[in-house]
UniProtKB/Swiss-Prot annotation:
This is Calcium-dependent protein kinase 10. Transmembrane segments: none annotated. It comes from Arabidopsis thaliana (Mouse-ear cress). It is a lipid-anchor. Residues 327-357 are annotated as: Autoinhibitory domain. May play a role in signal transduction pathways that involve calcium as a second messenger. May be a positive regulator controlling stress signal transduction. CDD domains: STKc_CAMK. Changing residue 92 to M: Loss of function. The gene is CPK10. Residues 364-399, 400-435, 436-471, 472-507 form the EF-hand domain. Residues 63-321 form the Protein kinase domain. ATP binds at residues 69-77, 92.
Length: 545
């Protein structure tokens, strides 16, 4: 993706005042979500031994790096060929310059450790080798070139409950294998399952262990991670274990069977509230035609009480999974394939928006928050106590009362040590200033609004969605336009664009740090409005503080 090459021009005839994004001022606007929250961006020191056990030889001695396959926050994935065997592989080259915090480095180390620890499995992408030089960490792994799960389903002309059961079994086996080896994936979603090749009988492979963690029985975790649609209620409550993977797998199976997520809303907080309520819709098509056995499994995988939810082993023992080959072979209908196609294409559009946003995350804008942290940290020990937070908020003109400040302190202090480190402080600032990163939304909107009309029109949407898979078909474009274009004028204005991006977006695609801080802010909001306590009353559980 390149730089924004179009500017928004006023159109007095067409544009509405509320829908027209103003040209951003990069010098004034605050953006706390970019890059390095703990040190100045220059000079950049060279990290050594990010992966201590990596190969000491150069990657070029064994492999030839070819064309680019994809691009993420920290690096680029290339086609990679073994010099001796000529085997085609993938190499994820992670830029060490972009590993700006200790958390970033630990994420990479843990991902490599987990992929190295997991035994070889036909449905998990295999890490072949890791290399490290002055500029990059290189992870050489199996190549998956068969496309994403939903794209394959949509491409087939015939889609049945039996086919969905076969995919569900594979996903459950992956979860079972991970859990039996002490690994919690924490980010199961359709995009993280790819087909190895384009053959009809290609194995499905789980990828992306970047948010995975090792666990022991009884361990509890508090960090809010994952993707909004697939997040278990106990993740939002910051008290969870491996049952979150079963929940996420249950969400995927629900989508496989009907084409839409079970918990949906127009905002991130709305999605979270739907998850906490846990009400499943089994009434609209095609659910009346789906077997009771399938519905039974989904209900038990999406039980909001993790102590009552099925384990991965119990999922595999469920009759619907055990008898997957005997599941009804009646087509689920064009409506499911159409919904899956739209869901997949909408995700692709959001990913392109996130790519644009990622390219505009500016390190320099973080200085304002760094200065605020320094101002409040009276004794300069790198942490902020409750008295310092209270006094500091008064210094910057906050009108919050003592009860609200105490609640902010309790929720933002994720590790419970009684003070806020820099990362926890950023979450407080996001919440207080209600920063939804409108500046970055405006930049992204301008990128897709090629003619500067202050609208994204059908041709511009088509261009945005065209990729290596070719032109999107007209019906999918119409469906996306119909969903996003709420005022039904045949085009997407800025407000409609922002609403789309605030519904279930995986912000980790733009920035892991931004994603983490958004979820902390979401937790603060849910705690503040009593939503988590409502969920406690329904399930009999409590939220740790």
């Amino acid at each position: 993706m390149g730089n924004c090459n179009a500017c928004v021009r006023p159109d007095s005839k067409e544009s509405k005042p509320s829908s027209k994004p103003k040209k951003p001022n990069r010098d004034r606007k605050l953006n706390p979500f970019a890059g390095d929250f703990t040190r100045s961006p220059a000079p950049i020191r060279v990290l050594k031994d990010v992966i201590p056990m990596s190969n000491q030889t150069q990657i070029s001695d064994k492999y030839i790096l070819g064309r680019e396959l994809g691009r993420g926050e920290f690096g680029i994935t290339y086609l990679c060929t073994d010099r001796e065997t000529h085997e085609a592989l993938a190499c994820k080259s992670i830029s060490k310059r972009k590993l700006r915090t200790a958390v970033d480095i630990e994420d990479v180390r843990r991902e490599v450790a987990i992929m190295s620890t997991l035994p070889e499995h036909p449905n998990v992408v295999k890490l072949k080798a890791s290399y490290e030089d002055n500029e990059n960490v290189h992870l050489v792994m199996e190549l998956c070139e068969g496309g994403e799960l939903f794209d394959r389903i949509v491409a087939r002309g015939h889609y049945t409950e039996r086919a969905a059961a076969a995919v569900a079994r594979t996903i459950a086996e992956v979860v079972m294998m991970c859990h039996s080896n002490g690994v919690m994936h924490r980010d199961l979603k359709p995009e993280n399952f790819l087909f190895a090749n384009k053959k009809e009988n290609s194995p499905l492979k789980a990828i992306d262990f970047g948010l995975s963690v090792f666990f022991k029985p009884g361990d509890k975790f508090t960090e809010i991670v994952g993707s909004p649609y697939y997040m278990a209620p106990e993740v939002l409550k910051r008290d969870y274990g491996p049952g979150v993977d079963v929940w996420s797998a249950g969400v995927i199976i629900y989508i496989l069977l009907c084409g839409v997520p079970p918990f949906w809303a127009e905002t991130e907080q709305g999605v979270a509230l739907a998850i906490l309520r846990g009400v499943l819709d089994f009434k609209r098509d095609p659910w009346p035609q789906i077997s009771e056995s399938a519905k039974s499994l989904v209900k038990q995988m999406l039980d909001p009480d993790p102590t009552k939810r099925l384990t991965a082993q119990q999922v595999l023992a469920h009759p619907w999974i055990q008898n997957a080959k005997k599941a009804p072979n009646v087509p689920l209908g064009d409506i499911v394939r159409s919904r899956l196609k739209q869901f997949s294409m909408m995700n692709r559009f959001k990913k392109k928006v996130l790519r644009v946003i990622a390219e505009h995350l500016s390190i320099q804008e973080v200085e304002v928050i760094k200065n605020m942290f320094s101002l409040m940290d009276d004794d300069k020990d790198g942490k902020i106590t409750y008295p310092e937070l209270k006094a500091g908020l008064q210094k910057v003109g906050s009108q919050l009362g003592e009860p609200e400040i105490k609640m902010l302190m309790e929720v933002a202090d994720v590790d419970g040590n009684g003070f806020l480190d820099y990362g926890e402080f950023v979450a407080v600032i996001i919440h207080l200033q209600k920063i939804e990163n409108d500046e970055l939304f405006k930049l992204a909107f301008m990128f897709f609004d090629k003619d500067g009309s202050t609208y994204i029109e059908l041709d511009e949407l088509r261009e945005a969605l065209a990729d290596e898979l070719g032109e999107p078909d007209a019906s999918v474009l119409s469906d996306i336009m119909r969903e996003v274009d709420t005022d039904k004028d045949g085009r997407i204005n800025y407000d409609e664009f922002v609403t789309m991006m605030k519904a279930g977006t995986d912000w980790r695609k733009a920035s892991r740090q931004y994603s983490r801080e958004r979820f902390k802010s979401l937790s603060i909001n849910l705690m503040k409005d009593g939503s988590l306590h409502l969920h406690d009353a329904l399930t009999g559980q409590t939220v740790p503080v």
